């Protein structure tokens, strides 16, 4: 699960950087399923630059059994933006050849 934890941390950091317009949205291709990229775009439009940049603070991972036999994990954590703390969560699943992909995402 260490590989999954490293992937989750890197993916959530990249999502927050895209929302803050520090990275291009194209850098999420392959990390997230297609529909989630659109939701990150909408969060990108709502982000207020006056609040400061998002900084991922804590990430935890819980392995789960998937009914179709693929490895999966629920990921939850927190990030700060300015003086406020926010929640972030996602589900990652192992896809072909041992790669991971974010299949669900919630940004609080």
Q: What is each stretch, according to the model?
A:
Residues 1-50:
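Core segments of small alpha/beta cavity-forming domains
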Residues 86-108:
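Short beta-strand edge/turn micro-motifs at domain boundaries
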């Amino acid at each position: 699960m260490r590989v999954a934890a490293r992937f989750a941390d890197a993916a959530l950091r990249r999502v927050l950087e895209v929302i803050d317009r520090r990275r291009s949205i194209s850098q999420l291709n392959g990390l997230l399923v297609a529909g989630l990229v659109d939701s990150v775009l909408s969060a990108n439009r709502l982000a207020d630059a006056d609040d400061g940049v998002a900084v991922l603070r804590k990430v935890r991972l819980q392995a789960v059994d998937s009914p179709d036999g693929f490895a999966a994990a629920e990921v939850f954590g927190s990030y700060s933006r300015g003086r406020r703390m926010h929640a972030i969560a996602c589900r990652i699943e192992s896809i072909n050849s041992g790669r991971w992909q974010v299949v669900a995402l919630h940004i609080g």
